[in-house]
Every structure is written in structure tokens, then in C-alpha cells.
């Protein structure tokens, strides 16, 4: 069965989509986005959505911090999207699917992605950072990130799918050492968080 993903028409992105990088947002902006999703969001077959830049696939994207460190992951070749093999990331997240449907699909999908991708024995507290847009490459052209941070406060975090990801907390110098392999979104967010060269 073909995966269906939540998309928002470009012209319905609150505040517009004509920006590059991370646009800071607050709770009011998140509420506006939620209303836009409830009003104009729709599900498309993923293969169709991947080739349709008139729509943005919404991706909740979470960066886990522990003080000055960030959870840095390296993707293996076992991951699903070959465009991302061998790349590094400071965020976890993924597509919103019909299983997330309801009054707050965005937050339901965010929580589902957290549980699918990470192993923790504590409850995360998601803090909105902003919207992330990058139309400079084929992956970014069809996605819109909704970026959150979570503070680990010294608590353990591990990746769930060891065959697809390897992860550990890293300080700014370690993130900088992986800079050339960072996915575009990760480099944009890392720079905003003061973790880039």
C-alpha cells in the first residue's frame, strides 16, 4: 500500500513560504499553522507529493539538546531514502500520515515520530523553534519543517533503529567536524542554534 502524507498547498503556508532557512515562530504561529492544516491540509500519495513542489509536506523535526550538546545521528545505507544515505542529522522527524489525523495532526505526528525514532525513559517537553524551508534542492523543495527542541537534562537518549542510524550527543566542535555530511536542514538549524562553523 502506498504511503499517504499530509501536505499543505504552498500558498496556504502561514506567513508565506518565500523564505530560506529557519523562520522563528511562537505559540501563536503554531496555532495559525494548526488551523491551516485543519482547513487546507490534505493527504497525497507520497510518490506524487515527492514530485509536486506546489505542495509542502509537513515534517515535524525535533532537535534533542543536553546543555551545550546536541544529539547527532549518522544515517546508514539501510535507510529508506537513498538521497540521505551517509548523511548526518541533528533532528528526528518524519511525514504526517492519516494515522495522525484528528484535531492536532501536527502534534500527534510529532509524538509518533519521537516514539518511532528515539528510545527514552522520560517524557519530552517540545518547545517550538520555527518553520524551516529550503527550496534549493529537490528534497527541500517539497518539504516544510516545523522545528522543535527538547532538553534531555542529562537523561539517556538512543536511536531505535540501530540498522538505519547511529547517534550520540556531540558538542559544537563535533558537529562542525561532521559539517560536510550534515543534511541541509540540519546545517540550517545547527547554524541558528550556534552549533555551526
Where are these regions (language model features)?
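Short amphipathic alpha-helices in soluble, non-transmembrane regions
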Residues: 160-163
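N-terminal leader/linker segments that precede catalytic domains of diphosphate-processing enzymes
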Residues: 1-158, 172-197
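Basic polyanion-binding and macromolecular-assembly surfaces
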Residues: 166-168
Amino acid at each position: 500500500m502506498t504511503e499517504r502524507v499530509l501536505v499543505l498547498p504552498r500558498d496556504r503556508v502561514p506567513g508565506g513560504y518565500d523564505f530560506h532557512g529557519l523562520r522563528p515562530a511562537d505559540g501563536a504561529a503554531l496555532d495559525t499553522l494548526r488551523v491551516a492544516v485543519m482547513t487546507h491540509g490534505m493527504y497525497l500519495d507520497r510518490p506524487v507529493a515527492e514530485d509536486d513542489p506546489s505542495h509542502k509536506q509537513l515534517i515535524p523535526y525535533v532537535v534533542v539538546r543536553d546543555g551545550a550538546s546536541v544529539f547527532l545521528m549518522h544515517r546508514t545505507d539501510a535507510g529508506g531514502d537513498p538521497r540521505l544515505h551517509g548523511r548526518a542529522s541533528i533532528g528526528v522527524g518524519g511525514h504526517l500520515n492519516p494515522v495522525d489525523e484528528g484535531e492536532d495532526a501536527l502534534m500527534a505526528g510529532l509524538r509518533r515520530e519521537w516514539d518511532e525514532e528515539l528510545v527514552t525513559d522520560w517524557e519530552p517537553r517540545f518547545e517550538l523553534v520555527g518553520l524551516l524551508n529550503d527550496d534549493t534542492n529537490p528534497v527541500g523543495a517539497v518539504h516544510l519543517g516545523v522545528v522543535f527542541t527538547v532538553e534531555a537534562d542529562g537523561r539517556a537518549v538512543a536511536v531505535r533503529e540501530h540498522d538505519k542510524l547511529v547517534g550520540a550527543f556531540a558538542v559544537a566542535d563535533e558537529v562542525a567536524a561532521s559539517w560536510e555530511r550534515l543534511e541541509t536542514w540540519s546545517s540550517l538549524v545547527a547554524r541558528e542554534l550556534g552549533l555551526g562553523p
